[in-house]
Amino acid sequence: LSEALVKLPGMKLRESGGVGSDMQLMLDGFSGKHVKIFIDGVPQEGAGGAFSLNNIPVNFADRIEVYKGVVPVEFGSDALGGVVNVVTNKHRRAWFLDASYSYGSFHTHKSYVNWGQTLKNGLTYELNAFQNYSDNDYHIHNWVREFELRDDGSIRFPPIDKTDVRRVKRFNDTYHNEAVIGKIGVVDKPWADRLMLGFTYSRFYKEIQTGVRQEIVYGDKLRRGYTI
């Protein structure tokens, strides 16, 4: 969804790397907590990294509503910069299936499926699921500081030569996220046009790479999280 958002006037997006990298959304100069993200009117502050806008596939949304300045009352009053509301597909056909899969560089896999059915008695159910995976083992150009181990076991830090720029390959930077949204309810009833009960589950796995200018080196560090 992030690629679709940046085409809107006043919208800017900054990412710090490959798939699963940190993202900062700017709306007319406002960013961070001043711009609120919603999915079908539900705030996503505690939904976890799997529901970051740069991880959600574009098939997931029917449309994207962007409010600048004046924000509708249902989104609260603390969004000084504005609101981005992702409205998901609400299929009304008897049966539907939408699926996609893509493969890219650095062992990047992205997949999405949206499946559901509406019965004649008004009972309806729907399942949305998507996942993103990438090794993020691309090359970068930067100067590298070599450490020297002395005979006594101590480490010598030689002067940094910033003219010695090398092409190095990133490692320990794998990212993987999964999300499942299930809904069940009724439609077209005298007492309700649409009444749904849903659940959401997501998880992410993010490896942390040692920085190219880092003096204290750590290995195989990662972050992971789950939401339900």
Predicted regions and their residues:
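Short sequence motifs at beta-strands and strand-loop junctions characteristic
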Residues: 19, 76, 104-107, 168-177, ...
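Hydrophobic, lipid-facing positions within transmembrane beta-strands of outer-membrane proteins
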Residues: 23, 82, 95, 109-113, ...
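Periplasmic-side early beta-strands and strand-to-turn transitions of outer-membrane beta-barrels
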Residues: 93, 102, 118-216
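Transmembrane beta-barrel domains of outer membrane proteins
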Residues: 28, 67, 87, 114-118, ...
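A beta-strand signature from Gram-negative outer-membrane beta-barrel systems
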Residues: 58-100
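Extracytoplasmic beta-strand/coil segments of soluble accessory domains associated
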Residues: 2-43
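Short acidic/polar hinge/loop motifs at secondary-structure boundaries
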Residues: 7, 34, 42-69
